[in-house]
A protein has these predicted regions:
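Conserved catalytic alpha/beta cores of large enzymes that bind or transform nucleotide phosphates
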Residues: 202, 207-209, 221, 360-399
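Gly/Pro-rich turn-and-neighbor structural signature
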Residues: 121-124, 128-146, 218-322, 389-453, ...
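Short, flexible loop/hinge motifs at secondary-structure junctions
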Residues: 1-197, 263, 267-268, 527, ...
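Mobile genetic element proteins and their domesticated derivatives, centered on retroelements
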Residues: 64, 140-141, 175, 206, ...
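Active-site-adjacent "gating/activation" loops or surface patches in catalytic cores
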Residues: 163-218, 286-303
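Conserved beta-strand -> loop -> alpha-helix junction used to position metal-binding or nucleic-acid-contacting
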Residues: 265, 326, 331, 342-376
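Short helix/loop capping segments that flank catalytic or ligand/cofactor-binding pockets
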Residues: 149, 183-186, 275-277, 304-306, ...
Length: 570
């Protein structure tokens, strides 16, 4: 049985409209999905590019040159095509630097300055003690031949001085008074370490071995045992902590007060270090915590260190809050409280100065990852450094004017380029990071133009922190917060001794004997900056005797003038 024929299907007008609406909705959804997918793909591509750049930087830190200097051959291999495109910019910058070199006459060297040594060192100019060995011909000497001279040659030799036992013999006298005999003992000279096992010279040796040479106590313990001096590391740690705390509360404290009161430029930076906390109540050791060391390079007068448990704005305010001058630091926000704190009655305060070396690192990383922006910024910063190096060769009195005349145009051109390039550089990558750092730090970076005494960067503070970093690798951690504070004081003394070309061992050995006799208001006279003048006014026989009382001379005129200018009444 056949089915009846179906009626002709005629689409209604309403069905066509519904299909058109559904098609439009589907097309809109498809467009949205495509847009979302494109955004995700672009984001993933940016992530892949950033990870590739991070991998490039990590490989460079592992296998490349650890310094920030790049030799011409290295740049040509890595950035050959980019360098070719920036040839015109390089020529323009070279021309600007050439104008400075033509205009600036270098400062003449003082009369009597020795030329730079060439070839092998001439040991005949050394002030070291001499051991003369004559090599003779026994047969010719016995036969009566006339000796007509010697052929002299010199070598640097070493003789171990070693330890010795210092015996202090205090005389006792029988005194007869009113037919009665009494025993009278000569008063012993004052000392920082009464009834101590170690003399000040041994303490100075332990301190300089660890904090000047980076020898941890366990290695020093082995070396002392080889020399016949049995001294355990616990004893050494106790003496070092005692000496460091005394120096920190006296000489280093006076140096900090002098720096905050009289310095014009302070360069500062900070680094971390591990601190061993105390054991729990049940005697279990705890994991090390992190502390922080701040350094302050004070003009050309001192290098100081301070320890804190936390890297915070509160500590920075306590440390530098009373300073009135230029404070050069990195872009860490802990320093902002010094300049952007609550308004004060006086406009005089800390003026933060930026660091072109930090900016250069951001540009360098962008250039290594083949961003043209990074290379252009690097070339411009190099021109600023080259022009400023020429300015620094001029007499100090005219450096500010020369820097304003020749370096300022390069700095103005650099920041004009930064703002223009930042507007057309999209994304979140190393290029935008470098440009953002430059734009955010423009005010602080421009402050180097205010005076010729300001360096372009903060690298001298970073160099001062190297001893902390080397120690961090050598002895891993500090025993307590108190020991870290003592270490900061010792680092301050040793770094300042290096700055003023003093032997840290001799300085510490003599200071630890002189300090008990010095008055509190004159501790600055014992700082490395003034020690040569102070030492020259002490009696030589008192300094030469291992145990001696000291006659304190009148105040040093130069230090007295500094102290008077720092007093509240001035």
């Amino acid at each position: 049985m056949s089915s009846p024929p179906l009626p002709d299907a005629k689409p209604s007008p309403m069905a066509g409209v519904e299909l058109a609406d559904q098609l439009a909705v589907l097309q809109a959804e498809l467009a949205a999905i495509k847009t979302e997918t494109a955004v995700k793909v672009a984001s993933l591509e940016d992530t892949i590019a950033n990870l590739a750049h991070e991998n490039t930087l990590l490989k460079r830190r592992l296998y490349g040159n650890r310094t920030e200097r790049s030799h011409t051959s290295e740049l040509q291999l890595a950035l050959g095509d980019l360098l070719a495109g920036e040839a015109e910019l390089q020529r323009a910058l070279d021309g600007a630097v050439g104008k400075v070199e033509d205009a600036v006459e270098p400062e003449s060297k003082p009369a009597g300055s020795r030329p730079a040594p060439k070839g092998r060192r001439d040991l005949s100019l050394s002030k070291l003690p001499r051991v003369v060995i004559e090599i003779l011909h026994e047969e010719l000497e016995a036969s009566g031949c006339r000796r007509i001279g010697f052929e002299d040659s010199s070598q640097l030799m070493f003789r171990r001085g070693g330890f010795a036992v210092l015996v202090k013999r205090v005389a006792k006298y029988e005194v007869i008074h009113d037919d009665e005999a009494t025993v009278e003992t000569v008063p012993s000279p004052e000392t920082l370490f009464p009834r101590a096992l170690l003399h000040s010279s041994a303490i100075a040796h332990v301190i300089t071995s660890k904090f000047a040479l980076g020898v941890p106590h366990y290695r020093l313990e082995q070396d002392l045992a080889n020399q016949g001096a049995q001294l355990d590391r616990g004893t050494m740690s106790r003496y070092v902590e005692h000496a460091g705390n005394v120096l920190g509360a006296t000489i280093v404290h006076a140096m900090w007060q002098d720096a905050l009161t009289n310095a014009q430029v302070i360069s500062t930076d900070a680094t971390g270090a591990l601190i061993q906390p105390a054991k729990t109540k049940d005697g279990r050791p705890q994991a090390c915590k992190k502390g922080h060391f701040f350094t302050a390079v004070v003009d050309c007068d001192a290098i100081l260190f301070a320890y804190t448990e936390a890297h915070t704005s509160a500590f920075v305010k306590d440390l530098f809050g009373s300073f009135r001058g230029y404070l050069q630091a990195d872009a860490s926000n802990v320093y902002d409280v010094l300049e952007h704190g609550p308004p004060k009655d006086s406009e005089d305060g800390v003026r933060l100065v930026g660091c072109f070396a930090h900016l250069r690192r951001y540009m360098f990383e962008a250039a290594i990852c083949r961003y043209p922006v990074g290379l252009q910024g690097l070339l411009r910063i190099r021109a600023i450094y080259a022009a400023d190096r020429v300015v620094q060769r001029a007499p100090a009195a005219g450096r500010t004017t020369l820097r304003d005349q020749y370096v300022r145009p390069l700095v103005d051109d650099f920041f004009a380029w930064v703002h223009a390039t930042k507007q057309i550089t999209a994304g979140r990558n190393l290029a935008t990071k470098a440009l953002g750092y430059a734009a955010n730090q423009e005010v602080e970076l421009r402050r180097v133009l205010e005076t010729g005494e300001l360096p372009l960067d903060n690298t001298r503070a970073e160099r001062a922190l190297r001893k902390i970093v080397v120690g961090r690798k050598a002895w891993m951690f500090y025993g307590s917060d108190t020991h870290a504070e003592a270490a900061a004081a010792i680092f301050s003394i040793i770094a300042s001794c290096r700055l003023h070309t003093l032997d840290p061992f001799q300085y510490l050995e003599e200071i630890l004997r002189v300090l008990p006799y010095w008055t509190r208001d004159r501790y600055l006279e014992l700082s490395p900056k003034y020690w040569r003048a102070t030492r020259g006014r002490l009696r030589a026989e008192e300094l030469a005797t291992p145990i001696s009382a000291f006659e304190v001379p009148p105040p040093l005129g130069e230090v007295a003038a500094v102290s008077a200018s720092a007093s509240p009444s001035s």
